[in-house]
Amino acid sequence: MKIKQFIAAVAALILSACSTLKDGEYNLSVVATGDGHGYWFAKPIEDGGRARGSLMAQSAFVNGIRESKGADNVILIDAGDNFFGSGAPFYYNYVDTTSSHLYPRLASYMKYDAVVAGHSDFESGHRVYDRVAKEMKKEGIPLLAGNALSDRNGKPYFPAYSIIKKGGVKVAVLGYTNAANASLMDGSCVSGLRFESLLPLVQEDVDKVRSKEKPHIVIVVAHTAMGKGDGLKLEKQGLDLFKSLRGVDVVVTGHDHANKVMSADSIVVLDCGRTGQNAGVTDIRLVVKGGKVVSRTLDARMTSIKSEEYDTAMEEAFKADYDKVRSFITGTVGEIKKGLVSREFYYKQSDYMNFLHALAISAYPVDISLSATLLIDGKVPAGEVRYQDIRKVYPYENKLVVLRLTGAEILKYLEASYDAWINTVTEPYENAHVLKIKQSKDYSTGKMAWKLAKSPANFDSAAGINYTVDVTKPYGSRVVITDMADGSKFELDKEYTAAITTYRSVGSGGLLKAAGLEDMKSVEDRIVYRGPEFRTILYRYFKKNGSIDPAVVGDPKVVGSWKFVPEFAPAAIKADVELLYGK
């Protein structure tokens, strides 16, 4: 026998031996977490914060299982969304970018066997998830996402699977992110990537891995919602996998923050909840005779994690990190000179909306800003602002997008916005409801109550121009734009740069479609800049300017002006607002 053939034969025997179990019984536990969203610490990082689920509480739970089952019989995996979405990851993602990122160190401390990249992890941006993946690799933990493919070579950007040995048992863990990622976030977050549907990809990968690696147990971890199992929703393919996969023992899902367990024949599926409040556990019993698995039993359950029972040794190990994060979160970033009242936006140009427009204008040299309210009926009080207050000032994770729109398209956009906002009224005006409201049953009281006919999340106003909105005119002729904020001419056939949010850029509210941009390709072709989160913009605005002053953010030479006409309109709309929310 030639040397090469001999070596190959020996290698084959070794591989065969590695895949063959000794006769007997094997008991393993698969512990699954997910959707932690950066709730890492057991104690609050904000002043006045409450105790809640945490990674440290989950660590105590995992420690208990390892003590009872034996550490080598426990597999710890995570379904993603771990380093984006709260104050602690913000600090390590965007403020302290020179130290080692905290999440890989936490995952290493807890001895995770594999972690999936969730949609929010991708939303953090290339700089963040590339850095985290690199540091996790150094810690010996794979960040998996087998359906995130590189445009450059068509191969997975992150590993598709990992092989783990536990108690002599060979376990394959295949990991996938959400197939709808491209539609769930700004394109700059996932530049150079495309996302494949989990069907039929996962089954194809399972078949390849089973053939190549010959595992005894196969686990699929997918950051996808459960869904209905009808195969219709890319974002919700959990039950699709559960119903269709063959040769898989455990399916772990996430994304929708549900707590669900289902089983059928030889497969179980678990959806592990959110923010450290739950963990899924699957006990697997294998009986081996003659080197083959002759019996396989699966028992899956969901367990609530007690927030007060956390890993104190882990807390002590990461105390310096906690102190740094808490110092940042509770530190003063700026001041609001005068309280901002959101409900004023319904009937007039308001300080609150001027502030939102000013943020966009401060971040990029745009001609026009288009934005809706973030607070339906709220107040931003005057006074000192700490970082922990930024979420109250700007409660959503929108990002800035700048695109090119013609004057005619901006006019159509505003017409569509105000058509969702107001009715056309005719004389007599005294009792007219100018705001689009309706009466319907309030299920909390059982009584009839006034409600908005449309969502105010789509009531966009504009800054950078001067215009009026005539409530006596029909749709298509209400908005009259007189000129730009600086007094220059507004032209219908001229292209302007306009600031919008990522919420609007993906077609939400239908305003871009009403403006004439029929599909996402039309929108993508017009985009000239993709900016950071507005919370980051707000943080930077405070660091640069020190305060939000209505006299500054409301400068008419910058934000322009707008109003409802005729004269009765603002008071009539205000009366409608009081029907909704009281005086």
Label each PLM-derived region with a short phrase.
Residues S19-E308, Y347, D351-L359, S369, ...:
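Acidic, metal/ion-coordinating pockets
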Residues A11-S19:
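Hydrophobic h-region of N-terminal signal peptides that target proteins for export
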Residues L21-S29, T33, G38-G48, R52-G64, ...:
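Catalytic centers of hydrolytic enzymes
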Residues Q5, L174, R504-S505:
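A composition-driven signal for long, intrinsically disordered, charge-rich low-complexity tracts
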Residues A9-V10, K228:
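Intrinsically disordered, low-complexity segments enriched in polar/charged small residues
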Residues K2-A9:
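Sec-dependent signal peptide recognition
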